[in-house]
Amino acid sequence: MIVFVRALGVEHLGEQPFADSIPWLPTGDTVFEIGVLVDPTGAAVLFFVSITIFMIFLYSVGYHNFGQPAGDHDRAGLPPHGATVEEHGHKHVVPSVEPMYSRFFAFIGLFAFGMYTLVVSDNLLTLYVGWEIMGLCSYLLIGFWYGKPSARAAAIKAFLTTRLGDVFMLLGIA
């Protein structure tokens, strides 16, 4: 945070933004490129996106009970029910770890990658790729507990809603 605030006071900071691109899909006379562009505005957004992603990861570790034992009756696709442990001769139920803990964090990590791609994109093609990655991950995260009918219905609703927006976005790009 200190570095960010100090960087705001530096003169000529945004005169040389970082930009790079690579040819991705050559089609005849046209070459589609994928690239990145980090200017002062993009750097500020990256800063806040990074803080947000860190907070999401930190919250998720506690929410999914990392470090707790596996539950006796937990099943993949459903929220954890709790684990029975014996301490000092007494049995009691404690929160149990999410059965698909690593899968959840893979989805969150991919969502973060899509968000970073969206922020640093230097053209509409790269922006669209980042947007689609985020849309896919939104569907996967909303329907993470797929054993619950309400989670499945919400995931499908979110998927269809974002696909409608994607069609119009793609038409606007074309």
Describe each model-derived feature in a short phrase.
Residues 1-174:
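...captures the hydrophobic TM-helix bundle architecture rather than a specific catalytic motif
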